[in-house]
């Protein structure tokens, strides 16, 4: 409770954020960095823009490539459209993801994009320009593998 309060989050909000971190991370060692990124976005009042929340909002867990049409859904779980945390968890958070939120890595990252090697890791960025470079590489890798949906 004390660690949650230090983050200006309730225990429920920690669970919600931990569920997003779990949905985003394929590797446990990356969870504290992802948690730190989302906490940075929350503290700056920036939309979370978390793809796992969009997949949840669309109720389509077959989505491998989030497209613009997915981002337009009017659903409070769509963190591309609604600021702050969604109203509830998008999945059951793990102890590891809860721990990652409560013991997040402090850094200045605001953006992340999956690596184009499909390792399950992310490239992190501090600026839009850095992020756009990473995103273009990943989009090209998706295109090369003919991943359209």
Predicted regions and their residues:
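Bacterial extracytoplasmic/cell-wall-associated proteins, especially those involved in peptidoglycan
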Residues: 1-149
């Amino acid at each position: 409770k004390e660690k949650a309060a230090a983050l200006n989050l309730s225990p429920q909000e920690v669970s919600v954020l931990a569920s997003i971190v779990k949905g985003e991370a394929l590797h446990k060692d990356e969870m504290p960095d992802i948690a730190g990124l989302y906490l940075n976005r929350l503290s700056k009042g920036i939309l979370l823009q978390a793809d796992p929340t969009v997949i949840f909002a669309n109720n389509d867990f077959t989505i491998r490539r989030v497209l613009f049409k997915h981002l337009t859904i009017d659903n409070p779980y769509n963190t591309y459209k609604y600021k702050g945390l969604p109203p509830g968890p998008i999945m059951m958070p793990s102890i590891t993801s809860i721990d990652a939120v409560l013991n997040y890595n402090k850094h200045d990252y605001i953006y992340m994009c999956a690596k184009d090697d499909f390792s399950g890791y992310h490239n992190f960025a501090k600026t839009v320009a850095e992020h756009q470079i990473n995103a273009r590489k990943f989009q090209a890798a998706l295109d090369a593998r003919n991943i359209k949906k």
